[in-house]
Curated annotation (Swiss-Prot):
UniProt-recorded Gene Ontology molecular function terms: ATP binding; glycerol kinase activity
One BP annotation, GO: triglyceride metabolic process
Binding, ATP: R15, T268, G313, G416, M417, I418, A419, N420
InterPro entries in the cross-refs: ATPase_NBD, Carb_kinase_FGGY, Carb_kinase_FGGY_CS, FGGY_C, FGGY_N, GK1-3_metazoan-type, Glycerol_kin
GO CC list: mitochondrion
The name this protein goes by in its record: Probable glycerol kinase
PROSITE patterns, alphabetized: FGGY_KINASES_1
Pathway: Polyol metabolism; glycerol degradation via glycerol kinase pathway; sn-glycerol 3-phosphate from glycerol: step 1/1
Reaction(s) this enzyme catalyzes, per UniProt: glycerol + ATP = sn-glycerol 3-phosphate + ADP + H(+)
UniProt source species: Caenorhabditis elegans
Enzyme Commission (EC) number: 2.7.1.30
Upper taxonomic lineage: Eukaryota, Metazoa, Ecdysozoa, Nematoda, Chromadorea
Record keyword Transferase present: yes
Record family assignment: Belongs to the FGGY kinase family.
Length: 502
């Protein structure tokens, strides 16, 4: 038996998962929730040591479960990493200790730094470097987070002066802690705002513009090769041989390996990736151009257009924790099925701004259309619809950017929210596309495990593609007139939320 394993470190939890190479079947796993810290409004941090410690604990617990099944840990032939992207960590090379909390991708503290950077560009535009990086100048990406750390954390400047400063996204931190290798993969590097997308190298121009030292950045490697081996613990000697940003890992897990194939992940936020092949397309419609994957140093880089949404599972959590409308996410479906519509209510849950296609970090959440008959059921249904509306806007942007009029006819979806069948029906109706759910629920983990297996030569792409991935398919039940009217109303609601925090 060949087992492929994956570390999946996300905004909500750390996981370690073990899959059968031949079938993709999940053999066993362990998950530990991780804390998000909110020291100020708009600030979101995590403890880097907690991220590492929970990963190590998940590995140990999973190995215990594996052995209880009568399976030896020796059957694990490779490990891949899927990680929350953009989240930025600085640490001391000598002590191995973080110099500050991880600044999470959702964090907006660098909004003023983004404005200042935009004002220094020749075009006075957030898109000054989009042709080179595929990204706008925005607080979402790592470059501005690192700049803030240099400006505000004296320990960072001291470590740099002493030649001990290390910086990376979560993948780099974990791989370094587990193997000693100081690397990132090309998919994660493409999320920093420091990568030249065409050369796949750190950009001297961008590092100089943001006043960041290029020499502290990790080595860029492909998504599937041996970076190092576990240096201690129950996996000692096992190759760590795959790495993908979590959304790219989901794209691989869904088998979106050919141009035009598209997936949408509903995690804390919402992330749509459309495979665009080996030539990057720079979006004119508010999408990001990002690296999808590269399976080996000598293989071509495959790119993707990405819609990144700030609205996702965090909306359900908000309804549970802040409004107390539900005590458990599982209550949402029954509650929402008890009403026919939202009674005219529209919920724009832009708590930390809006991403694709608006890129407005000053947008804030709003509920419109409340009347004396509005109940919590209507607000909950409006929340589910908000997530689907956001995805519909992403699909429209993708299709406008795709050359040759390519249509996205099917959307492959994953994430915690798709357990709600009503939500899948809502997606199909609002987007006017077939919605396909996967057999494998841990799709990001599976994608990372496959990358690790390819990197360690334990599985081939052909073997992977022979496996069936589809579970259920939902088809639209509403017509185009209904869809157009609803989307127009949604866009009107979004307008009201934009610019609020200026």
């Amino acid at each position: 038996m060949v087992l492929l394993a994956a570390i999946d470190q996300g905004t909500s939890s750390s996981r370690f998962l073990v899959f059968e190479a031949d079938t993709g079947e999940l053999v066993t796993s362990h998950q530990i929730e991780v804390r998000q810290l909110f020291p100020h409004g708009g600030w979101v941090e995590m403890d880097p040591m907690e991220l590492y410690d929970t990963v190590v604990s998940c590995i140990s617990k999973t190995i215990e479960k594996l052995e209880n099944l009568g399976i030896s840990a020796d059957e694990i032939k490779s490990v891949g990493v899927a990680n929350q992207r953009e989240t930025s960590i600085v640490w001391d090379k000598e002590t191995g200790k973080p110099l500050y909390n991880a600044i999470v991708w959702l964090d907006t503290r660098t909004s003023s730094l983004a404005d200042e950077a935009i004002s220094r560009t020749a075009s006075k535009s957030k898109d000054e470097f989009r042709a080179k990086t595929g990204l706008p100048i925005h607080p979402y990406f790592s470059a501005l987070k690192l700049k803030w750390l240099f400006q505000n954390v004296p320990e960072v400047k001291k470590a740099y002066a002493d030649g001990n400063l290390m910086f990376g996204t979560v993948d780099t931190w974990l791989i370094w802690k587990l193997t000693g290798a100081y690397v990132t993969d090309v998919s994660n590097a493409s999320r920093t705002l420091l990568l030249d997308l065409h050369k796949r190298k750190w950009s001297t121009q961008l590092c100089e513009f943001f006043d960041l030292p290029i020499e502290i950045l990790p080595e860029i490697r492909s998504s599937a090769e041996v970076y190092g081996h576990f240096d201690k613990g129950p996996l000692e000697g096992v190759p760590l041989s795959g790495c993908l940003g979590d959304q790219q890992a989901a794209m691989v897990g869904h088998q979106c390996l050919n141009a035009g194939q598209t997936k949408n992940t509903y995690g804390t936020g919402t992330f749509m990736l459309c495979n665009i092949g080996t030539r990057p397309i720079i979006s004119k419609n508010g999408l990001l151009t990002t690296v999808g994957f590269q399976f080996g140093a000598d293989s071509p880089v495959v790119y993707a257009l990405e819609g990144s949404g700030s609205i996702g599972g965090n909306v359900v959590r908000f309804l549970r924790d802040n409004f107390k409308f539900i005590s458990d996410a599982k209550e949402m479906e029954g509650l929402c099925r008890s009403v026919e519509d939202t009674s005219g209510a529209y919920f724009v849950p832009s708590f930390t701004g809006l991403y694709t296609p608006y890129w407005d970090s000053t947008a804030r959440g709003t509920i419109l259309g409340l009347t004396q008959v509005t109940q919590r059921e209507h607000i909950c249904l409006a929340a589910l619809r908000a997530v689907a509306f956001q995805s519909a806007e992403m699909i429209a942007a993708v299709e406008q950017d795709l050359e040759g009029g390519t249509k996205v006819t099917t959307l492959k979806v994953d994430g915690g929210m798709i357990a709600n069948k009503l939500f899948n029906e809502i997606q199909a109706d609002i987007m006017g596309r077939d919605i396909v759910t996967p057999k494998i629920t841990e799709i990001s983990g599976w994608g990372a495990a496959v990358a690790g297996g390819i990197g360690a030569q334990q599985i081939s792409l052909d073997e992977f593609l022979q496996q069936s991935s589809e579970d259920n398919r939902y088809t639209p039940q509403k017509d185009d007139n209904w869809r157009s009217a609803e989307l127009a109303r949604w866009k009107e609601a979004v307008k009201r939320s934009c610019g609020w925090a200026q």
